[in-house]
């Protein structure tokens, strides 16, 4: 017995669309390319009508009784479907959680850089996890870290809303911000 090949070199089996001669049902409910019902016709006659018009007979609904077919240009139909799929894929944005890390003893410029990063993440539609991490005995100053996170939330209030207030989690203090759906209207002091 010859050894079995290590890799399956066969081409993947693609499910071919049910068009023209691949349709095996004897009776079909046929819809014209304009959307007009042609009624229940046998398969051979429906294929003749499609070929006379230079179009394809495409199985639309297999579960109906009798199955529904449509006379259309299959190449054009397939192109439109792929175009729609690309558009929906382009429009959909998966929200990710981006993290901005810092210590509670952060310098002004470093803080401004973290604010800039957070603004960029929020504008692209992602959530932001603001983390203040402690080393050694710094954990005793968790109130300063909470103050820093609240200041950050205040500085970012035009772009974001606080999803989770600052809370301690192990040796870190975290806060979650999400992009603001409606623009913030500032109250005028007068």
Curated annotation (Swiss-Prot):
PROSITE patterns: IF3
Keyword field contains Cytoplasm: yes
InterPro entries, sorted: T_IF-3_C_sf, T_IF-3_N_sf, Translation_initiation_fac3_CS, Translation_initiation_fac_3, Translation_initiation_fac_3_C, Translation_initiation_fac_3_N
KW Cytoplasm (keyword) present: yes
GO molecular function: ribosome binding; translation initiation factor activity
Keywords: Cytoplasm, Initiation factor, Protein biosynthesis
GO cellular component annotations of the record: cytosol; membrane
Cross-referenced Pfam families: IF3_C (PF00707), IF3_N (PF05198)
Places the protein is found: Cytoplasm
Segments forming a coiled coil: none
Gene Ontology biological process terms, A to Z: ribosome disassembly
Family statement: Belongs to the IF-3 family.
Role played: IF-3 binds to the 30S ribosomal subunit and shifts the equilibrium between 70S ribosomes and their 50S and 30S subunits in favor of the free subunits, thus enhancing the availability of 30S subunits on which protein synthesis initiation begins.
NCBIfam families: infC (TIGR00168)
Assembly information from the UniProt record: Monomer.
Name of the featured protein: Translation initiation factor IF-3
Classification lineage: Bacteria, Bacillati, Cyanobacteriota, Cyanophyceae, Synechococcales
